[in-house]
Amino acid sequence: MDDQNRNLILATGLSFVVILVWFLLFPPPEMVEDPNAIPPAAETGGVETDTGIALTPPVTVADAPAGADTTAPSEVALSEAARIDIDTPAVEGSISLLGGRIDDLSLRNYFTEVDGDQIVRLLSPVGSDDPYYALYGWTPSGDLGYADVPTSDTPWELESGTILTPDSPITLAWDNGSGLIFRRTIEIDDRFMFQVTQSVENTGGAEVNLAPYGIVARHGLPSDLQNFFILHEGVVRKVDGELSELGYSDLPDLDIIAREGVPAEVMEVETNGWIGFTDKYWMTTLIPGENQSFVSVVKYVPSAEIYQTEARLPYMSIAPGETAEVTTQLFAGAKEAEAIRDYENAEPGLIASLFGAEQDASRGEIPRFIDSIDWGWFYFLTKPLFWLLHWLNGAIGNMGLAIISLTLIVKAVLFPLAYRSYVSMAKMKELQPEIEKLKESAGDDRQKLQQGMMELYKKNKVNPAGGCLPILLQIPIFFSLYKVIFVTLELRHAPFFGWLNDLSAPDSSSIINLYGLLPNPAPEPESIMALIFIGILPLLLGISMWLQQKLNPAPTDAMQAQIFAWLPWVFMFMLGSFASGLLVYWIANNTLTFTQQYLIMRSQGFKPDVFGNIRSSFKKKAKEEK
């Protein structure tokens, strides 16, 4: 087998190995409800543990009669309590006066379907199909109990404001009737950030100690859970400068902490941390105040299948006649890189600055918030590639063309490596006849063959590994490009041309709809039919890989020839259900690689006979059939 074919097998084999290892190490989680699950901690008065960590009250979940449907349409759930509307350019929804929950939030600029008019619902109330909400409150201590502080079912009253907008905050109030008046002022900006100020006024005659907290709770798994090995979905948090992640499947396996009564993980944060849930495109995150210490808690309540993140702040002493307050933030929205970077208030960096990114100091400072986007292992490559793609999309106005342009730029940058690789391959091609003679003369004496080949390489100043190293160096860049295209929010519902109206979805064309000529939908990506009725892009991908093979004659070994003959079509079916934006990248990359290799090989005196190799493969196949 010549070295050029060996390099191609090496690159293909490495891709297969990486995919297989990922699936073996990180299989999709299988969530099975435990019938013997431990119930959440019971409500008690005066909760301050011997560790000094305050406990939050369990979230109230209404009981349903046996055999009843435990979910209800969101409209019904929303009507069960008085509400205050939310109205901003980016989001719409409402806040429930029952518990003061932020539990109804939809994203105005994002739709569930490409041609649909239903906007994405991020947060939903208890009683709906997918309850997901943020809740705030106070943990009591001493003689105070949970009846003395606001909890998840406290009836708040609207004290000021009418509708929550970027220009008009609202204030909720609740008097416990025992000398404590609680207030909650909620503000929102024009993107996705809430600011929640909790205060307590002590009108009684004794000092009280209370600990504020925030909760983000999710009942059950997300309906749009991707479960894809290169994407993190679940808990994301920053603890003293370090980013920590837990998948949804990890939470039930956490150790059961006695004081929590359920599987949980507790971390103390000295300053500038945050915690919440992240999905592929959306995120809901609690952010305590700047330089605020707190306890970061992740837990799972098996009895109700609730995934929960909490930020518990230290106890505060409130003397008679005094008022204490604490301010936290809540991010609930789309993972728009520019918005998240602005909230981080980070300098964009050289690469991002070159492509139009600017610092916005008006939105606070949340350290490492940009890392809530899953940049992957090669983040140092993924980030600049993302900003370049983002800039190209803005400049060109078409994400498909931006992907092709990005591929072209990366190919240009990597040209020196590719040139060395292909020159080395061309030189090895020239030596192939002499290598064959050495094999014949050496026979079964492998030591003699190796010695003769090394002398031949030395005489002709050829490095046999010269074609492999550039390929290996390009692998991290390949994975970074793959990651960028996979996680980029701008790819969602982004059109290219013709039938390609969503680059984040698989190619919708198939023989069923005459490849886009008929309005019939393509098979679901998860179905077996999708493997059979593949679209135009997977076909083009297979053809581009097949043509790339034809730059070289087929291997003389029959087994190797069969493997090479099947590889393009195996990849065509394997990758057919991937996002069409990824296929656009792979097709563009294969086309540019073919062109580069053809021109470089010709410049070195080796003239690839593409059409001759194609004819030869068909003649060989016809002979085998006879």
Curated annotation (Swiss-Prot):
It is found in: Cell inner membrane. Signal peptide: none annotated. One of its GO terms (biological process) is protein insertion into membrane. Disulfide bonds: none annotated. The keyword Membrane applies. It is a multi-pass membrane protein. Coiled coil: none annotated. Keywords: Cell inner membrane, Cell membrane, Chaperone, Membrane, Protein transport, Transmembrane, Transmembrane helix, Transport. InterPro entries: Membr_insert_YidC, Membr_insert_YidC_N, YidC/ALB3/OXA1/COX18, YidC/Oxa/ALB_C, YidC_ALB_C, YidC_periplasmic_sf. CDD domains: 5TM_YidC_Alb3, EcYidC-like_peri. GO terms for molecular function: membrane insertase activity. Its main location: membrane. GO terms for cellular component: plasma membrane. It holds the Pfam family 60KD_IMP. The chain crosses the membrane at residues 8-28, 399-419, 469-489, 527-547, 563-583. Required for the insertion and/or proper folding and/or complex formation of integral membrane proteins into the membrane. Involved in integration of membrane proteins that insert both dependently and independently of the Sec translocase complex, as well as at least some lipoproteins. Aids folding of multispanning membrane proteins. Belongs to the OXA1/ALB3/YidC family. Type 1 subfamily. PANTHER family: CYTOCHROME C OXIDASE ASSEMBLY PROTEIN COX18, MITOCHONDRIAL, OXA1. Interacts with the Sec translocase complex via SecD. Specifically interacts with transmembrane segments of nascent integral membrane proteins during membrane integration. This is Membrane protein insertase YidC. It comes from Jannaschia sp. (strain CCS1).
